[in-house]
């Protein structure tokens, strides 16, 4: 089936037709050891090699007939008038936690002077070092301008942007424009707002919104999975809370996007398992990757909607049987990341062995470094497209994290 709407995603495994990426840019070079935790990184990727790896990832998708879109390009194309462009700059500045009126004025002048829209977008992503700004006359400084800190940035970079899965999530024909866990990442959702409001193809109300970035509760796209045209899966995780899920589901059901049930997975709250898709992804009609460490503590709730109310039931019993019953298959194979070896499972999950991108039933993009998990997947009859990711993985995300499907064929 060919999509008749700008967004069409009714599974995790239908043939991928169109996908959104972000090529890592100068924001990566604004990482520094003293502030890694603040920016949600554990290490600093080498940008030149990260870009080569990302370009190879994009080309691997194109080689499979997939149209690759870029976040920075769509955002630039959304600044369709001078008024919208200026509004974007002002909204960006209002969310940037800038210290000092004079500093904010200097940054606004810097951004307004950038004539090319894509260059402007990329600059907002990269952040602004204090050293880039002209010296502000003492007579123009307020108290916050005068009380200088040693922090080198007037505006923080957004180094997590190459994980396009999280700021918004495509669900059916709609989109969840998320309110993210950290202030560092929540600014990323501004690009999605302008794309789905003003872009010639994706804006103007063509795509229903099922969650709004101005909500006070948090949700991220790595916790939103489309298992089938009838069933969604959501994760209650380090980055997504139950209150957000309730709001999301009410909106999805009210907007009649076609879904009948949601499976909510509650699992350990820590950075190793920050999202559902870091421990659980669908790779075929009846196969999933899973990290064995979550299985013991996992709780699953079935959520349906009737008479304008959510109905929630805690599921008991075997996870594979539960998934099989909800997907209408005889049985489900849960493929453990790292197999039965505890050390391999921990290492390969840390390097996103469970975070796979399925581009067609049984055809999966993976990092080549997760050799044990990959061998198990191949032994199950899956076709693997292996990509290098030694620098990309330093951000703690795999092929699914780095991609947001815009169109899949129905299954």
UniProtKB/Swiss-Prot annotation:
Record-given protein name: Arginine deiminase
User: One GO BP annotation here?
Assistant: arginine deiminase pathway
Write down the NCBIfam families for this protein, in alphabetical order. Answer: arcA, PRK01388.1
Write out the annotated subcellular location. Answer: Cytoplasm
Specify the superkingdom. Answer: Bacteria
What is the active site of this protein? 401
Cellular-component GO terms for this entry: cytoplasm
* Pathway in which the depicted protein is active: Amino-acid degradation; L-arginine degradation via ADI pathway; carbamoyl phosphate from L-arginine: step 1/2
Checking InterPro entries in the record gives: Arg_deiminase
The text of the family note is:
Belongs to the arginine deiminase family.
Query: Which organism's genome codes for this protein?
Result: Streptococcus pyogenes
| Purpose of the protein | Antitumor protein. Has a powerful and dose-dependent inhibitory effect on antigen, superantigen, or mitogen-stimulated human peripheral blood mononuclear cell (PBMC) proliferation. It may inhibit cell proliferation by arresting cell cycle and inducing apoptosis.
Query: What EC class is this?
Result: hydrolase
Q: List the keywords (alphabetical).
A: Arginine metabolism, Cytoplasm, Glycoprotein, Hydrolase
An example molecular function term from Gene Ontology annotations: arginine deiminase activity
Q: What does the entry report about post-translational modification of this chain?
A: Glycosylated.
């Amino acid at each position: 089936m060919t999509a008749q709407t700008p967004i069409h995603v009714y599974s995790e495994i239908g043939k991928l037709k169109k996908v959104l990426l972000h090529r890592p840019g100068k924001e990566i070079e604004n990482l520094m050891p003293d502030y890694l935790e603040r920016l949600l990184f554990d290490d600093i990727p080498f940008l030149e090699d990260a870009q080569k790896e990302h370009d190879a990832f994009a080309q691997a998708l194109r080689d499979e007939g997939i149209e690759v879109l870029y976040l920075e390009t769509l955002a630039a194309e959304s600044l369709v008038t001078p008024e919208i462009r200026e509004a974007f700059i002002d909204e960006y500045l209002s969310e940037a936690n800038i210290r000092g009126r004079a500093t904010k004025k200097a940054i606004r002048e810097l951004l307004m002077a950038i004539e090319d829209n894509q260059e402007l977008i990329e600059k907002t992503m990269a952040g602004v070092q204090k050293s880039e700004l002209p010296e502000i006359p003492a007579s123009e400084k307020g108290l916050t301008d005068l009380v200088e800190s040693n922090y080198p940035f007037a505006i923080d970079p957004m180094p997590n942007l190459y994980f396009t899965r999280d700021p918004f999530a495509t669900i059916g024909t709609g989109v969840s424009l998320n309110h993210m866990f950290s202030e560092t990442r929540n600014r990323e959702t501004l690009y999605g707002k302008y794309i789905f409001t003003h872009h010639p193809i994706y804006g103007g109300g063509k795509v229903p919104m099922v969650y709004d970035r101005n909500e006070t509760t948090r949700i991220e796209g790595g916790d939103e999975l489309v298992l089938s045209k009838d069933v969604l899966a959501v994760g209650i995780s380090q980055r997504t809370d139950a209150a957000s899920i309730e709001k999301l589901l009410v909106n999805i059901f009210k907007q009649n996007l076609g879904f009948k049930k949601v499976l909510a997975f509650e699992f350990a709250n820590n950075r190793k398992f920050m999202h559902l898709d870091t421990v659980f992804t669908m790779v075929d009609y009846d196969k999933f990757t899973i990290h064995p460490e979550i299985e013991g503590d996992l709780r699953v709730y079935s959520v349906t909607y009737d008479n304008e109310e959510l109905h929630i039931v805690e599921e008991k019993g075997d996870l594979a049987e539960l998934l099989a019953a909800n997907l209408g298959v005889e049985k489900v194979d849960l493929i453990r990341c790292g197999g039965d070896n505890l050390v391999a499972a921990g290492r390969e999950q840390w390097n996103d062995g469970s975070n796979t991108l399925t581009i067609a039933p049984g055809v999966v993009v993976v990092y080549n470094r997760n050799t044990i998990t990959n061998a198990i997947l191949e032994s199950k009859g899956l076709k693997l497209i292996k990509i290098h990711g030694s620098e990309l993985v330093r951000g703690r995300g795999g092929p699914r994290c780095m991609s947001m499907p815009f169109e899949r064929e129905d299954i």
